[in-house]
């Protein structure tokens, strides 16, 4: 090994310590910058733009092709993480630092995200003509397809309007309009015609054409955001639609929603009681929950451990959503879609672990109520969870096959300091999960494969390093992460590469290396 390689290993081994808010010793980096940023996705929602850029730059300079492919995975609303702000911020860096790389992937931006993800490129001297030519070409295709009664893209829905209340939006609209050689009147007319052909629900709402809305065709997010407006302005038709939905006679779109989006809508703040309470049973929310894509597929080898500690009550960025909302939503989602002994079961942990049984919950509302009742709002003692699993195995003389193959920890990663029963066996620098692994080994068991799902870390502490203990490190809010959770891959970096090197992201690589 060369001197620099040895130095890198020395840094990772002896100069890589980080500490959580509650004193647990972990690491600053996994050893791979791409793995670091992937594990930090949820935390970056609350980060400043420069912090996002600094995190991405390290991965970009480590391996540009992999970093850009990962960025499209991060943005991917259907098969990835669905992170819009992170994608736009990192792409802005690429556009400024290496515009030729950004130019190559512009044709794929709308495929993985939305057309308006590229409007900020209009501020870039190199990329502006590339974006404008792309818009021109796509619009011509859409007009031809419309005239031939074929499906068209959603470009018209996202094109900026010249009469927008936002000055910035109007600037972008006029840049595009002038490139197309249109007057303001012609531009508005074209967008109106294409949006009418697309059957955009917001256009009908603005025109108060409630009776013309086809509820079975309303997109996922619109179903969630406008549910109250539909009931208020078109209650009879909306109720008729929801009744058919319960009977399985129609469908509802929910493919790009996050579980916590739905769970959070069930919450309301009760000022008289000074705390949150649950709203009444909601047919639309229940239907949207059932329509979420099933990424678990009855896998029965995984037990979820959901953090219910006090730090999980911190809100995520500028939303009312808390890390606890996310953890409860993912725990319910995973538990009810599992099979075998772990179906409708998960563990919650703070100062003491509890087994949560969702069997009595008939509706999503019921299950949220059960989950909330088990939120202890104390400190975060993850070690106690593994002690519970181990003692259960020992007391019942279980084999290795009887205990969970995977333990999925959904948390803000601010764990308590490791506590050893025999202090002589672990030094003050003992890492929390090394301590736990030793306990299992002494009892004749292998530690279950660990999956850490970060939903809001604030110290940036990584619980384990690359190739340690056979773990997966994931982050974000999308159920699409479940494929990585249930993967048998023991190396966290390879687990991530399996995802971003899949066929789904091959078009990105093809354009980059062309």
Can you annotate each of these PLM segments?
Residues 1-326, 336-514:
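Long lumenal/extracellular ectodomains of secretory and single-pass membrane proteins
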């Amino acid at each position: 090994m060369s001197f620099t390689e040895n130095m890198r290993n020395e840094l990772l081994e002896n100069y890589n310590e980080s500490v959580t808010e509650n004193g647990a010793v972990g690491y600053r980096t996994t050893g791979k910058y791409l793995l670091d940023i992937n594990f930090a996705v949820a935390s970056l929602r609350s980060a400043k733009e420069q912090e996002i850029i600094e995190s991405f730059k390290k991965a970009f300079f480590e391996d540009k092709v992999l970093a850009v492919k990962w960025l499209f995975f991060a943005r991917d609303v259907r098969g990835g993480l669905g992170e819009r702000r992170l994608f736009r911020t990192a792409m802005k860096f690429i556009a400024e630092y290496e515009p030729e790389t950004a130019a190559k992937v512009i044709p794929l931006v709308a495929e993985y995200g939305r057309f308006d993800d590229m409007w900020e490129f209009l501020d870039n001297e190199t990329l502006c003509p590339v974006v404008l030519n792309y818009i021109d070409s796509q619009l011509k295709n859409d007009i031809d397809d419309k005239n031939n009664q074929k499906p068209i893209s959603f470009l018209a829905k996202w094109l900026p309007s010249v009469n927008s209340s936002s000055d910035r939006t109007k600037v972008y609209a006029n840049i595009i309009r002038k490139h197309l050689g249109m007057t303001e009147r012609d531009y508005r007319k074209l967008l109106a015609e294409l949006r009418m052909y697309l059957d955009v629900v917001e256009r009908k709402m603005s025109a108060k054409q409630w009776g013309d809305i086809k509820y079975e065709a309303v997109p996922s997010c619109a179903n969630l955001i406008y549910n109250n407006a539909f009931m208020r302005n078109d209650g009879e038709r909306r109720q008729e639609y929801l009744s058919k939905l319960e009977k399985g006679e129609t469908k509802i779109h929910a493919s790009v929603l996050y579980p916590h989006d739905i769970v959070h809508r069930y919450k309301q703040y009760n000022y008289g009681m000074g705390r949150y309470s649950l709203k009444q049973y909601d047919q639309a929310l229940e239907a949207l929950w059932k329509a979420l894509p099933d990424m678990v597929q009855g896998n029965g080898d995984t037990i979820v451990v959901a953090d219910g500690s006090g730090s999980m009550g911190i809100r995520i960025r500028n939303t009312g959503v808390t890390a606890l909302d996310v953890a409860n939503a993912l725990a319910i989602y995973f538990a009810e879609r599992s099979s075998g002994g772990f179906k409708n079961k998960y563990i919650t942990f703070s100062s003491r672990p509890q087994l949560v049984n969702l069997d009595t919950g008939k509706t999503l509302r019921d299950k949220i109520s059960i989950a909330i009742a088990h939120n202890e709002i104390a400190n975060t003692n993850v070690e106690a969870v593994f002690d519970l699993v181990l003692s259960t195995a020992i007391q019942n003389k279980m084999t290795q096959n009887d205990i969970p193959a995977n333990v999925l920890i959904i948390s803000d990663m601010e764990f308590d300091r490791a506590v050893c029963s025999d202090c002589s066996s672990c030094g003050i620098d003992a890492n929390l999960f090394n301590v736990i692994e030793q306990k299992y080994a002494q009892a004749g068991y292998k530690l279950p494969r660990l999956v850490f799902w970060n939903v809001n870390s604030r110290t940036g502490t990584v619980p384990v390093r690359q190739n340690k203990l056979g773990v997966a490190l994931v982050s974000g809010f999308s159920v699409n992460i479940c494929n990585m959770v249930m993967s048998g891959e023991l190396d966290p970096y390879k687990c991530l590469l399996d995802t971003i090197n899949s066929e789904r992201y091959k078009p990105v690589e093809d354009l980059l290396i062309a």
